[in-house]
């Protein structure tokens, strides 16, 4: 990261002169060359390398739109080529040249920095061999990336990837390589969009296209959403609807964890500070909108990112809102989003096998469907069963492939809830959420919830030996200790088990997520605990049976049944569900 403590001092030494930089075209990419900005030659030897990776930085200093890009590069070179003071009082040793290969200014103009065929430099400690360094002007922990900068960054990355045969999968932020916050939170959140050539376009983006906008034009709108209701550019669906002159946003509804995703217990009604609109909690006393709540609503919109497990509560909220829409003759629009853990893996006991899939209870633990597909299935299955069905419109995604996990969609990850910090957490969730039905900790209260098996009385080494004996695909284990806290990532959560107590734990890691079967892993984990700790292990029967939608698993474990025997018991029911599911897949 380009960090200097006395940037104003350095800029004061700019040579003010008239410059009409010639901009050249390179494969349709406009780049201001070193010659254009009157670069000095390197002052010492530079190390050649072969470009293999693309790494994004920010300058870490406030944007300076009034200064030309030529002057900025001259100042950067002056700073780089001599010993210079840093913000922390240390002295940066001289570099041969500007540290970055490309510089993107506030105007979106791109300038050539160091020759791309030579290694760059950094104030942080990482191996720069092969890294093409792109710096974007600004401090994106405090500032927003400008649209002009974003468009230029996309074009530049596309050019470099094509010209030097560099996979987009190699794109990373400086913070992925070293201990730093660079390139800042706003820019870093957008990097996934650079990794795929054709990112998924979510339903929220398509809502404003001509094909769909008439569904909401001049309508009074109620929105069910939370902090995940963001478009890839960082704009929130609520703000877009509130600001649009052709729509009238009248009511907001929030799910579990609230409309801002910062609450971990029952949520109360409130007012949205930004819009001044009332926010009705659908995870407190009220779980389904009432007729009174909907009297000023012409159309209901649902836009929330789910993770793909039945016991993640957002899809239950969606179904209840869908029921309310049907009962009150209000059109219901679902803005589709990816299934975070992919749309292929379907597994787990089916709550009411053989019956129409009209409720959440009829789903297996992992259903392999998007929220739009689920809404379609619930609606049509309800209609077949003589239950009220909604006037449903699913706005589908573009470029979505159901075998892709969330990090393959090109969409920025936004933690869907306080304890769902990463995609790895989401991958383990179908397995280790079952520990909520026991007296063990699943890791809530840590920065890796659902990635641990922990309790004061377990012996991690022997538990790992037992788990390894099952030879499960895609998972590894190691011993550790955890201390669950009530504050996680700045949010106060419901008090976790063993709060403030350091306890032994087994930490799990994904080694092959494509072949990892999370539901089966959950059964094997419960079996291992029952086998090794029959006296210490306690079932929380209502919770465990509620998660599994059956008491048969618990009873079988108590009877000493083997995991594969238990897993086999739901296979026929799963086949029946898959046949129903296949009718409603949109992708």
Region locations from a protein language model:
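Bacterial Sec-dependent N-terminal signal peptides
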Residues: 1-23
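Glycine-rich, aromatic-lined ligand/substrate-binding cores of catalytic
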Residues: 400-487
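Conserved anion/nucleotide-ligand pocket segment
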Residues: 355-429
């Amino acid at each position: 990261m380009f960090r200097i403590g006395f940037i104003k001092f350095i800029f004061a030494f700019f040579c003010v002169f008239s410059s009409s930089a010639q901009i050249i075209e390179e494969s349709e990419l406009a780049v201001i060359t070193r010659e254009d900005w009157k670069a000095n030659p390197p002052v010492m030897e530079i190390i050649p390398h072969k470009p293999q990776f693309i790494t994004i930085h920010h300058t870490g200093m406030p944007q300076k739109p009034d200064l030309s890009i030529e002057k900025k590069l001259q100042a950067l070179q002056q700073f780089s080529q001599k010993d210079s003071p840093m913000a922390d009082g240390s002295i940066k040793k001289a570099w041969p040249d500007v540290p970055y290969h490309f510089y993107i200014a506030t105007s979106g103009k791109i300038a050539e920095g160091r020759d791309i065929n030579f290694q760059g430099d950094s104030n942080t400690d990482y191996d720069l061999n092969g890294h093409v360094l792109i710096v974007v002007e600004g401090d994106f922990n405090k500032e927003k990336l400008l649209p002009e900068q974003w468009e230029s960054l996309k074009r530049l990355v596309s050019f470099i990837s094509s010209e030097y045969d560099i996979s987009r999968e190699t794109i990373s932020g400086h913070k992925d390589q070293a201990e730093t916050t660079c390139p800042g939170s706003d820019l870093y959140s957008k990097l996934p969009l650079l990794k795929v050539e054709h990112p998924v376009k979510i339903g929220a983006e398509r809502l404003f296209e001509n094909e769909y906008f008439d569904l909401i034009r001049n309508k009074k709108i109620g929105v069910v959403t939370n902090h995940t209701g963001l478009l890839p550019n960082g704009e929130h669906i609520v703000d877009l609807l509130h600001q649009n002159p052709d729509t009238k946003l009248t009511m907001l509804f929030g799910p579990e964890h609230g409309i801002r995703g910062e609450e971990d217990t029952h949520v109360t009604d409130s007012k949205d500070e930004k819009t001044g609109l009332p926010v009705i909690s659908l995870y407190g006393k009220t779980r389904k909108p009432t007729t009174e709540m909907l009297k000023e609503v012409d159309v209901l919109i649902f836009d929330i990112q789910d993770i793909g497990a039945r016991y993640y509560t957002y899809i239950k909220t969606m179904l209840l809102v869908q029921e309310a829409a049907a009962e009150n003759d209000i059109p219901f629009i679902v803005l589709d989003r990816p299934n975070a853990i992919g749309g292929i893996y379907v597994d787990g006991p089916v709550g009411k096998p053989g019956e129409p899939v009209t409720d959440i209870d009829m789903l297996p633990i992992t259903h392999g469907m998007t929220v739009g597909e689920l809404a379609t299935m619930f609606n049509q299955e309800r209609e077949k069963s003589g239950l009220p069905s909604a006037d449903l419109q699913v706005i589908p995604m573009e470029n979505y492939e159901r075998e892709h996990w969330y990090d393959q969609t090109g969409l920025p990850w936004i933690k869907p809830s306080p304890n769902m910090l990463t995609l790895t957490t989401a991958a383990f969730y179908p397995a280790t959420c079952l520990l909520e039905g026991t007296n063990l900790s699943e890791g809530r209260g840590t920065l890796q919830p659902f990635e641990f098996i922990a309790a004061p009385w377990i012996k991690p080494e022997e538990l790992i030996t037992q788990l390894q004996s099952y030879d499960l695909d895609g998972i590894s284990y190691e011993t550790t200790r955890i201390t669950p806290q009530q504050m996680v990532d700045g949010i106060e959560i419901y008090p976790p088990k063993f709060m403030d107590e350091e306890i032994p734990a087994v930490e799990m890691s994904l080694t092959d997520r494509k072949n990892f079967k999370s539901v089966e892993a959950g059964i094997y984990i419960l079996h291992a605990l029952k086998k090794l700790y029959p006296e210490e292990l306690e079932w929380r029967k209502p919770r465990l049976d509620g998660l599994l939608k059956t008491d048969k698993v618990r009873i079988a474990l108590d009877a000493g049944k083997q995991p594969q025997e238990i897993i086999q018991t739901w296979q026929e029911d799963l086949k029946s569900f898959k046949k129903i599911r296949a009718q409603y897949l949109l992708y």
